A protein has these predicted regions:
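Sec-exported extracytoplasmic/periplasmic mature domains
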Residues: 35-42, 57-66, 143-150, 180-183, ...
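Solvent-exposed, acidic/flexible segments
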Residues: 23-31, 42-53, 78, 131-134, ...
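Bacterial N-terminal signal peptides that target proteins for export
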Residues: 1-8
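Metal-dependent amide/peptide-bond hydrolase catalytic core
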Residues: 20, 197-207, 211-459, 465, ...
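Solvent-exposed loop/turn segments at secondary-structure junctions
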Residues: 42-45, 76-78, 89-92, 102-106, ...
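Hydrophobic h-region of N-terminal signal peptides that target proteins for export
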Residues: 11-20
């Protein structure tokens, strides 16, 4: 009997050791998928998300997915394709939808130390456009579905994956288009979005697991100065470029009002316990009523806190003049805003008009669906947070707790914007989180030399696979 008990104990230990080894060993398939996606240019100017969608479709078909369960769909633009794939489950529960965007922002080779569209491993990091935003999440999701398929795992609900176009801009947003034109293919009880939330780390050590509870609204505005112009040898008292520059200078110096909501207040309460003493004192002073204006100003020097405390608007593009030897007849700029919940794009447009304080300037909201300026913006406000899902929270706490013991799961407001907006607008709750860790002082979304720790990617692969299995009855 003792020998049988010992043998069973040995088998159990061996099984646990095998699982631990599998979870810590680099996943060659997941890395290969990541490399393939990075090296397919999906930027808006010259890229093609259809090529990326087709590449991922082939991966899934080669893994044994039925052709009927893997579709590449395009709308009016053949280069803005979307992948929809389904891992069939038992049907005990309604499906879960995973969303991820295939497109990336522009990247110029001359700005980078490496080629942004060549997957490069260097000094413990993967470099390339999309390594943080968000081809890591795309590759991880594809790898997880392939692994579950090959294992013969049957989830208790269908798992749908939608990898889509134009989240970063453009007029062919894939999630919006699928919700409006192919709802039957993506209909689910709720959605998961690896493009939101993050495991935040310091020098590679995880310190917080952020779960998106709400997000800001995205809005672009065009500000235009016009002038009769003339010969550059005869300067005028008024000048379109100077007038535009003066208005943008006023925006640069204007902080939008400080404002907290229940989600950002709870997040700050957590950060007060996690930050060094001086920063913690400022956070506590901000949480008081009334808040300390000096503490708000100090916290606002950190871009992460500044974007949490207020609506932000920043100039992102400039265009002006038509000849080197002519006075400018027109000068324009694009101002990008991320708007706090409770406020609308039209409200912010009116605020900007007051900030620019020049009635000669034309200020218009840019309709992202058509890329055309409009004289007024919508009254739409950010969606309220989705209701908590006990089964999702239980799975998150279980898997994250096993992988990063002691690291708290904290609800946050996404300070950018994500495709959760479109699922929520369609009545589908959306929850944003990712299992890849990013150092808080090394956030390179949309920036030069975008990179992700190799170890963080490998852990993210393990996390998402285990999370999906736990969530769907594994």
């Amino acid at each position: 009997m003792a020998s049988k008990t010992a043998a069973l104990g040995c088998l159990l230990l061996c099984a646990l050791a095998a699982r631990a080894a599998a979870d810590t060993a680099p996943d060659a398939l997941a890395r290969d998928i990541f490399k393939q996606l990075i090296e397919i240019n999906t930027s808006h100017s010259v890229g093609d998300t259809t090529v990326a969608a087709q590449a991922m479709a082939k991966r899934l078909l080669d893994a044994g997915f039925a052709a009927a369960d893997v579709q590449v769909l395009t709308g009016r633009n053949p280069k803005r394709g979307n992948l929809v794939a389904r891992l069939r489950g038992s049907g005990a529960h309604k499906p879960v939808l995973i969303i991820g965007h295939l497109d990336v922002v522009e990247a110029r080779r001359e700005d980078w130390s490496t080629d942004p569209f060549v997957f490069t491993e260097k000094d413990g990091y993967f470099y390339g456009r999309g390594t943080q935003d968000m081809k890591d999440g795309d590759a991880i999701a594809v790898a997880a579905l392939i692994r579950m398929k090959k294992e013969g795992f049957v989830p208790d609900r269908d798992v749908i994956l939608a990898l889509t176009a134009d989240e970063e801009g453009g007029t062919d947003n894939g999630v919006d288009w699928l919700m409006k034109n192919h709802r039957d293919l993506v209909d689910a009880e709720f959605a998961l979005n690896p493009d939101s939330g993050a495991v935040w780390s310091d020098n590679g050590k995880p310190v917080a697991f952020d779960l998106e509870a709400t997000e800001k609204l995205y809005a672009d505005y065009e500000i235009t100065a016009t002038n009769p112009g003339g010969h550059s040898s005869l300067p005028r008292a008024d000048n379109a470029i100077y007038e535009l520059a003066a208005a943008l200078g006023r925006l640069e110096k204007y902080p939008f009002p400080f404002e907290l909501n229940p989600v950002t207040r709870a997040w700050l309460e957590h950060m007060a316990a996690a930050e060094p003493a001086a920063r913690a004192r400022d956070i506590k002073a901000v949480l008081r009523s009334p808040a300390s204006a000096a503490a708000v100003a100090r916290l606002s020097q950190d871009p992460r806190y500044n974007s949490t405390l207020r609506t932000t608007c920043v100039a992102t593009r400039l265009d002006g003049g038509h000849a080197n030897n002519a006075l400018p007849q027109r000068a324009s700029a694009v101002v990008n805003c991320r708007i706090l919940p409770g406020h609308s794009p039209e409200e912010v447009r009116l605020d900007l008009a007051k900030i620019f304080a020049d009635p000669k300037l034309q200020l218009q909201w840019i309709d992202t669906a058509t890329d055309q300026p409009r004289d007024s913006g919508p009254a739409t406000k950010a969606m309220p947070p989705p209701p908590p899902r006990p089964e999702l929270l239980a799975a998150l706490h279980k898997v994250a707790g096993e992988m990063w013991p002691g690291v708290p799961i904290v609800s946050e407001m996404e300070t950018g914007a994500s495709d959760c907006f479109y699922t929520m607008a369609a009545g589908m709750p959306c929850y944003g989180f990712s299992g890849t860790a990013i150092d808080r002082d090394d956030v390179r979304f949309h920036g030069r030399d975008e990179r992700l720790r190799v170890s963080a990617y490998d852990q993210g692969v393990v996390f998402y696979y285990r999370l999906l299995k736990t969530l769907t009855g594994g």
